[in-house]
């Protein structure tokens, strides 16, 4: 799985969304780089799957919206019916979710916040802007690392 390859951990799935965390056993710089690399590779792999399968058999394409943020969180294990489940809570999680929601608004498949860029080893410049996030008082600087959505988005 791509998340494991990039040292991420799947935390939760809900409908067509998933939540992952990076940096549990690495530096903040490695976590930022790994999360960006994972996001870019997910987009590339989905393009390949669209070309080889979904377009061929269903005449459809699927796209993703990925939001990445960095910040302090609470991480723990919860036990439900004898099964341990990792959980991550905090404002940073909420901001990441809002950033993911904003991918449609800004028409870009991968958005990362300024905090992630600052911690990463990325040197090249990317399109950036300010965005107001629902439920968050301050605007956030975001960087668009993905691509525009196709018009026939499924």
Task: For the regions a language model picked out, list residue spans one by one.
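Short, conserved phosphate-binding/catalytic loop or strand-edge motifs used
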Residues: 14-20
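Alpha-helical scaffold within the catalytic cores of cyclic-nucleotide enzymes
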Residues: 1-8, 24-66, 70, 91-102
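Cytochrome P450 core scaffold surrounding the K-helix E-X-X-R motif
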Residues: 77-79
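Helical mechanochemical/support elements of P-loop NTPase systems and associated helical scaffolds
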Residues: 14, 31, 74, 88-95, ...
